[in-house]
C-alpha cells in the first residue's frame, strides 16, 4: 500500500476520532444493542437493527482510520528548511490576478482538506499546479470553474 502524506495536525485529528470511536461510541452502541435485545424478538426490533447498523459503520470507520494511520507518512513542515518552494504542508499566499483578491491555502493530505478553512488536498488541481513553484511565480491553474491565474506572494512552512 502506498504512503499517505499527512500533517502532524491531521494525524492528531484522526487519532482523536479513533479514540472517540473506540472509547466512547463503541461502548454506547454495545449498550444500545444490549438494551434492544432485552425488548424481545430481534426480527422485528427496529432499535436492534439500527444499533447493529451503527455498529457496522463505527467498526468500518475504525478500520479505515487505523489503515490510514498505519500507512501515513507524517510530515512536520516546520523541520524542513524553507527554500521558498511550494511543498506538501506549505502555507501559500496567492494573488488571484483576475480579481486582485488574496487567498491563503495550506497543502494538506486528502483527509485534512477543508476549503473553507483554507486547507487544500495535495491532490487538488490548485495544489498540483503550485507544487514546486516559488515566490513571484505566476501559475495558471485549471479549476472546475475555468482557468485561474495566481501569483505566489509568500510561502511559509508553519
Curated annotation (Swiss-Prot):
Gene3D superfamilies listed in its UniProt record: Transcription elongation factor, GreA/GreB, C-terminal domain (3.10.50.30), Transcription elongation factor, GreA/GreB, N-terminal domain (1.10.287.180)
One example GO MF annotation: DNA binding
Keywords per UniProt: DNA-binding, Transcription, Transcription regulation
GO biological process: DNA-templated transcription elongation; regulation of DNA-templated transcription elongation
InterPro entries: GreA/GreB_C_sf, TF_GreA/GreB_CS, Tscrpt_elong_fac_GreA, Tscrpt_elong_fac_GreA/B, Tscrpt_elong_fac_GreA/B_C, Tscrpt_elong_fac_GreA/B_fam, Tscrpt_elong_fac_GreA/B_N, Tscrpt_elong_fac_GreA/B_N_sf
Function of the molecule: Necessary for efficient RNA polymerase transcription elongation past template-encoded arresting sites. The arresting sites in DNA have the property of trapping a certain fraction of elongating RNA polymerases that pass through, resulting in locked ternary complexes. Cleavage of the nascent transcript by cleavage factors such as GreA or GreB allows the resumption of elongation from the new 3'terminus. GreA releases sequences of 2 to 3 nucleotides.
Sequence similarity: Belongs to the GreA/GreB family.
Protein name (database record): Transcription elongation factor GreA
Source organism per UniProt: Pasteurella multocida (strain Pm70)
